[in-house]
Amino acid sequence: MNKPTGFLEKSYDPYDPWMGPRGVAIRDAFYKGKFLGKVSAAIVVLLDWLFPNSLRLFLKVQPRNYPITVAQKILAAEQIDQPQIALAELMSTSVPDKSRFGNAWGLGFPWMSKNGLYNEHVPFITHTPYAMEALCKLMNYEICRDEATRDFFGTWQFMQSLLILHEDADTLALSYAPIDEPRIVINANTYACFAYCLHSQKNPTHKDEAKSRAIKIAKYVVGQQQENGSWYYYADKLPGNFIDCFHSCFVIKNLIKASKLDAEIELLAREAIAQGKEYIDKNFFDEKTGLVKRFTERDIKDPFIWDLYDQAEYLGILIDLSEFERADQLRKAARSKFCRDDIWYSKIDFLGRRWGKNFSRWGITPFEYSESKLKKSGQGNK
């Protein structure tokens, strides 16, 4: 992948039906347990499953750019011929309110979750670290080094805008976004841990504070691990909690990344990483197909059995842990199932049908990013 430009790529998305006012209202009613909300949500899911193209045409959905895919494409590139253009494209997807958030990135569309409504301009800790990594990569190019460095420093304001949802002498947990939230999201805090580690390494002004916060967050996350090695999505036992593959991989991935930047985190997270990986191997990996399954505990059902996002993130941690042979086997298995005639699909349903043609954000770009890491390791053959 050697592109002078082209990191901006508009595409459709699984969340298309839920981005408009009507979709937001339906999800809100669904999460509140209202009967009409449940019925309406079921109808939308059914239509989206059976007639995804027609539904998007009816809803007048337009493809859009997604901040996370821009960052991941920059990270996947072997060489960037025009890094100043890549930087401009990356920054063009950041949230507009710099006075409040500094440099930060979000989903790029409205999202109604169990925690409430996040508008399209709300930045997320689950997205901003990818852009931070991309900025660190762009710092290596002299032509844009100073600007990329300033933009990276500008993410500190966002980090400090996150709300403290838990803190004691040893541990810390932050919000998913800089708004009031009723529940702590565990994987989001691993992103915060990694982001603070990046600041500890790259931002001398805030080195000590960043390191302290990263360690406290890592201790919190490790403390939330279940005896069997798993992590729930939320740090509570309230209804609606679940354990799925790619969010579990997020936790492990970010602990690995943080461990590579901080020796103290490496020591305190080592066993948790090993136990978390073992849980995925034993409970998500399917020997028959060579793929990883979606859930071990779930709260909402849909028609889909396999998800490319799960394969992408599991592939990433296999590479991070130097399990290159298994990584290449997974890569080949996923390609054989989700890719046909060089066209990628995001999901596979219980009928064996591929769904989500070229939905870049959902699994496709993350998989390409993980593949690029395998290629750079010299262990994978396309």
Region spans (language model):
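Contiguous N-terminal and early-domain "leader" segments and peripheral loops that mark the onset or edge
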Residues: 1-32, 57-80, 129-132, 193
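Short hairpin/turn module used for nucleic-acid contact or packing/dimerization
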Residues: 332-382
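Well-ordered alpha-helical segments within folded domains of soluble proteins
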Residues: 64-79, 120-139, 183-201, 240-260, ...
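A beta-strand-loop signature enriched in Asp, Gly, Thr, and Trp
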Residues: 251, 257, 262-315
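Glycine- and aromatic-rich loop/turn segments at beta-sheet edges
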Residues: 13-31, 37-61, 93-119, 158-183, ...
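Loop-centered beta-sheet repeat module
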Residues: 179-202, 207-232
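Structural helix-adjacent loops and short alpha-helical linkers that scaffold large soluble proteins
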Residues: 1-5, 9-12, 78-88, 136-154, ...
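Long, hydrophobic, well-ordered secondary-structure blocks that form the structural core
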Residues: 128, 137, 146-171
